[in-house]
Amino acid sequence: MEPIHNPPPQTCSYSRPSTTYTSFKDASCGTKVTRIIIALFLIVISCGLILCAYTFRDLLDADYSAQEGPQQATKLLQQLDKVLTGPPLPIWDNEHLFQFSCLMQNKHRRVLPIDICNPLTKFNFLEYICNCLMTKQSVNVNETDMCELFCPPTCTPENYRRLLCTSSVFPFVMWHDPSADTQEAMLTKMDQTMSSGRVGNSHWVLVIVDIEHRCVTFFDSFYNYIASPQQMREQLEGLAASLGAIYPKEGGADSDQEELLSPFQVRIGSTVKVQSPGEFTCGAWCCQFLAWYLENPDFDLEEKVPTNPSERRALLADFISTTEQAMSRYSSLSWPTTD
């Protein structure tokens, strides 16, 4: 019987596959194409993530133009770099707008402070302004009883009546968010914005009614954020016609009735963008515009505002720094009293 010889146990050996790294220069044509496609794909993904990080407001604020030449585009980038340098400018909200209007009332006397307890939007501002001016008219002729006079919570009826009687310039601020398409949605969006503490897509614009000059002036630091200048003019012309009937021109007995009831003049105060992209300075620009208007109702905005973004920013920063301390006296939000 022959001995049985068992074969030696076989062992499994695992060999790690060798990976050869080649430079782009030494790679094959197919490898080069693959690497280029992957690189382009990663670039597109990165750009998409950057755009997602931007808020919708930032995208609206950005200026894009295919008509600018290379040199002009370089200048724009240099100016943008200058704008972004330095500390951010403070955000002026409704409380700041009220305080500044009180400061202007103290200086010019003919200005009615802004009532921030009644939020105005593009859906209700026409009716509200008409009602406010009709209230002034009835107060002037003593047709409104003190108990019937609506006044802001931080102002007494007696003081509000006196302010109405002595005022001829009525500034109104309008709040807007493009995502709201009804008055109810706009007010809900306003509450959400205030609760979050973030500006988001919200924006302030200014409407000035001047009885002495028979003029309605509209200002938007983005000039077309709510609507185009022509669309705003069409809306304001209806308001101007109503105001012309409320405050007819002075004339003799033989004066033409149609001429006496002629509409107020409508003026679009902003035909260019004065607010820089990435800055939330619409409230401060509204106050600056009001200050210029009270100095000279016929002023030209383009003559006041530099075309250079860094100079515009410096101008507004100087305006803010010189007025914030004086405004602080109205931080309690109490209306100024008439002497």
From Swiss-Prot:
Which gene codes for it? cdu2
Q: What is its EC number?
A: 3.4.22.-
Query: Where found, per UniProt?
Result: Secreted; Host cell; Membrane
Name a GO molecular-function annotation.
deNEDDylase activity
Active-site residues? 203, 220, 282
The EC class name is hydrolase
Classification via SUPFAM superfamilies: Cysteine proteinases
> Which is one Gene Ontology cellular component term of this protein?
extracellular region
Entry protein name: Deubiquitinase and deneddylase Dub2
Native organism is: Chlamydia trachomatis serovar B (strain TZ1A828/OT)
